[in-house]
Each structure stands twice: as C-alpha cells, then as structure tokens.
Amino acid sequence: SIGLEYELRLERELRLLNISFSDEKLLRLRGYDKTPDFKLDVPIAIDGFIVNWIESKALFGDKENHKGYLKEQLFCYWNRFGPGLVIYWFGYLETLESTSEVNNMFILRTRLPDKEHITQY
C-alpha cells in the first residue's frame, strides 16, 4: 500500500540519520494498543520542538481527516508519549497550523526535515 511505502521511506531516513526507534510491531509486543508509526528511543528536537514519536500519513491533511486522526490516534500518542511529529506527505491545509494542538502536542511537516533542523540528544 502507499501508506506502507511512505512508512518504509521514513524508516530508511531515520536509519540514515542514526535516529533509533521502536516501530509499531515492537510497541504492540510491549503491550501498547494505540501506537505511532515510530516511537523514538531518545527524543529529538525539530526546529526546537521536542519530538518523541512520528506518525506518517501518505495523504493530504485536510480538516476532516485531521480531526479523525486527532480523536482516534494523535491525542492517545500525546497522552502516552508526549509531543510528536505528524508527516502529511502530500501536504496539508495551512489552517491546521493555527489549531490549538499543532505546535503544542505535535508539529506538522510534509517530510522528515533535513539534518540541520534536527537536534539529536
């Protein structure tokens, strides 16, 4: 599926940057029911924002599907793991940037940022 294709791409990019993570399979083995695509073993900062997990979405982020993801997934990830990153590979509505959860609970991007925007601890 296209979703899996983009998850694998993200996995490759994380490995190239030497960012270690647990994937969904591993998290489920540890007993988590709701899991992001990647839970970082050590948090990173992207443009100064702390990121503990990354969720990959191979679609355009519009108001409707973003609202669904918030309710079904993103609030759970934030409650369990703290702030994270959601990647909408095909872009997202700019107005999502001004919602209360964005830049507080997680940040939105259209790809994994370049190395110079990432601080590794």
Regions found by a protein language model. Name each.
Residues 1-4:
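Interdomain/boundary linker segments immediately adjacent to catalytic/signaling cores
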Residues 10, 14, 36-63:
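Conserved catalytic cores of phosphodiester-cleaving nucleases, focusing on short active-site segments
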Residues 11-32:
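A short acidic/basic microdomain associated with nuclease active sites
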Residues 18, 25, 42, 58-60, ...:
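Short, flexible loop/turn elements at secondary-structure junctions
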Residues 23-24, 86, 108:
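A structural preference for short, hydrophobic beta-strand core positions in alpha/beta folds
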Residues 51-52, 56-101:
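Catalytic cores of nucleic-acid endonucleases
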Residues 90-121:
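Domain-level recognition of nuclease-like catalytic cores that cleave nucleotide substrates
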